[in-house]
């Protein structure tokens, strides 16, 4: 269905197009008015009327009409359907111009087709022309001008009409936008003419008021020509002018207007009109400056003033004649004090006179120096300075400029003596820019002033200050610097009052003609960095890069991730302390300097705050050290006060054998061997061996010979308890038995024990082995004997033992190896070794229990008994079943004593790696 509809629409469109092409001459309708021109601000209504033929062909009526302006549909509120063939549209307060209004229909209710279109024009009717005037240029047609009034936005025609009383002249037509019209004829002088203007457009037409005039009163003469200027040698202040007037001068009387100016000036000077009111062709201008070039121009008008001034003539110039200078040059001096004391080098300087004051070409200058009442010295100088050597006295210098006519008035300058002290400076000196000039203002001193000398120079660190100067009259207290001044440069301005007796004290200040932002910013650095603060410092910017007065500095600092902080610092400061910073933190900082015209940033600088504040580590370390020192001191004092107790536990008193009374216990018992302990001790360079008992872990069974001696050890222990002592308790490791060396010399050198073994008093004969040589040496120890050795009960025990019948058997303490197969061949044996039957394991257990009980019951000498018991147990141990050998090393040296030998403690002497006495 939709495809069929599309096909029908296309066929209908082709049909309508064919019909419309064939009937272009006859549209389906029309709009009236067809050429509307609407006055702006009014209402306008257009009506579209459809023809009956179109109604039938396109099956439409007036309700199918669509209005458009410039292809934009008009709102339905403005459309009115009059009947089935007509529809109207209304526009209120029309302001548009050149709008295309079209009437369209929707054929078959869908296809839009244009029926008719018109263009709507809007505008205003013409205003009455005003200010109508006419001018008659000499030798040309009359030109009239008018004011057409407001813009009409429509095509408007202006017609200029003129007539005599009996004759009309051709019209002059012009269109809107042109305010003048040239008449096509030359008017006749002395005959009045009437002129008016008519204006017309689609909305109406108007006429101006007519004007009536004589063309001679509207004439504009041609400008004067051939203007010339000449000077006079007699008078240097006049110039003579001559010219030729226009051709009307023969018909009309003309007066002239003369103006002049100096060559470099921009404004003209008017010659009074009353001086040129009469017709003339020459004139003399007076009161001019000598030797000055002037420019002149002239124009003319009718003598009665009616009509128009002619155009200005071509300019002509002339120069007045020379005259003597009207003013003395500005005069100043500088004294160089580096010469010997009797002379001064004075530099006299002066300014060139301007042309307006020189009144001619300056040929030279005359300088006269007078010292007190002496003869004057005259110098003729072509330049503007003179260097002379003066004494330390006062001088008076005069200066005059000379040209071809004569000399200028002389200017006098007093050069005071070398001991002169200047005073009375100006006060309240100010300098400020205004109107692109640098002004200087001051308050005069109370003393009368002849003149002021103003000096200025550019301050720079790269070049010297070369001053320029100017002179001002003594009545002046405000002036501007005359010279070529630069912007963004610092000027040092000095004002010196000059009195009749000499110059006063100079007063200086700095100023800028125009300031700018600095060329570079300050460079900041750290002076001191703490934990939470940092002292920043910087240098003042060089004057060459300041470009103005530094008002303030800004310091911007931030961390790598923090917000930037900004502080402002006065321009007089060169350092600033940043506080409330974070410890051990990297900061980035830069500075900017500001003038009144802007600022400039300096380079960025980084620093890191300290982790600890200054003195914080010392505050921690010093108290700790003091506390440690105090603790140590208290400990030392405590140890000193408790030295006896400490000595008792660490270094117990060891009896000195040399002072022992043991020899007095049995004084009647002679020694078995008479020998000198010092002379005969180990005379054969043989040393007592000190052996250490080593029990191999694999030995299970004790040796039979060792088990045999267990019973003897038990019996002997009872009788010897209380008669054995070593060096200092358990640490001395002394045995309750005398030890007999039984190992070879190489074995004794291997012992590294530090315990010194003393002999033990045994009250019985030696039962096992008696060494061939019994050697005792006197102990070199200075340690006292043990307390147990000095007790009286010990002495009684010794006596009772000596008198007893039973003598305890002596036990030998030696290294023994059981005879087992495979024993190490390098193990040393004693020459005599007792063979005992193998004991049972029960005997060994009983022996250990006995040792434990003895150790608990004996507080004194327990270590010696333990060591002795370990030696006895070692003797009792035999060879295990697996054939391994148990090795015993002797830890002491046995001393063989006979039953009738006197009991005494004698230290054992060990050499070459053995035990040395303490």
From Swiss-Prot:
Principal location: membrane
Occurrences of domain Fibronectin type-III (ranges): 125-215, 223-323, 328-418, 422-516, 518-612
Transmembrane segments: 619-640
Topology relative to the membrane: Single-pass type I membrane protein
Residue ranges, compositional bias (Polar residues): 773-785
Ranges where the Ig-like C2-type domain occurs: 26-120
Keyword Lyase included in the entry's annotation: no
Motif mapping: WSXWS motif: 309-313
Motif Box 1 motif, chain ranges: 650-658
SMART domains reported in the protein's UniProt record: FN3
Signal peptide stretch: 1-22
Extracellular topological domain: 23-618
SUPFAM superfamilies assigned: Fibronectin type III
Single annotated GO MF: cytokine receptor activity
Assembly and oligomerization: Component of a hexamer of two molecules each of IL6, IL6R and IL6ST; associates with the complex IL6:IL6R but does not interact with IL6. Forms heterodimers composed of LIFR and IL6ST (type I OSM receptor) which are activated by LIF and OSM. Also forms heterodimers composed of OSMR and IL6ST (type II receptor) which are activated by OSM but not by LIF. Interacts with HCK. Interacts with INPP5D/SHIP1. Interacts with SRC and YES.
Domain notes: The WSXWS motif appears to be necessary for proper protein folding and thereby efficient intracellular transport and cell-surface receptor binding. The box 1 motif is required for JAK interaction and/or activation.
Protein name as catalogued: Interleukin-6 receptor subunit beta
